[in-house]
């Protein structure tokens, strides 16, 4: 993971008691990543990075929450270029 910033969020204590701090942090990061992806602000890869998940794990979370993929021809071309560079 690259450089980043910490963001402080306030949650009621009972939520922290229910989920625990670690899970609450993971869920908050995931929900932010999903919303940024849904709005088209970040790519799939960047959203997965924000959520601290692999792309495969992030795709699973999108499917679990019925979030459609934002995949256009430009992203397809980028993926084709990356695969071409790997070969």
Curated annotation (Swiss-Prot):
InterPro entries: UPF0175, UPF0175_domain
Highest rank taxon of the organism: Archaea
Family the entry assigns: Belongs to the UPF0175 family.
PANTHER family associated with the record: UPF0175 PROTEIN SSL1255
Full protein name: UPF0175 protein AF_0597
């Amino acid at each position: 993971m690259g450089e980043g910033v910490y963001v402080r969020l306030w949650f009621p204590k009972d939520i922290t008691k229910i989920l625990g701090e670690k899970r609450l942090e993971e869920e908050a990061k995931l929900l932010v990543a999903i919303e940024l992806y849904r709005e088209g602000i970040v790519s799939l890869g960047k959203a997965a990075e924000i959520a601290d998940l692999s792309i495969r794990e992030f795709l699973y979370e999108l499917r679990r929450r019925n979030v459609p993929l934002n995949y256009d021809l430009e992203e397809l071309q980028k993926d084709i270029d990356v695969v071409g560079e790997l070969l």
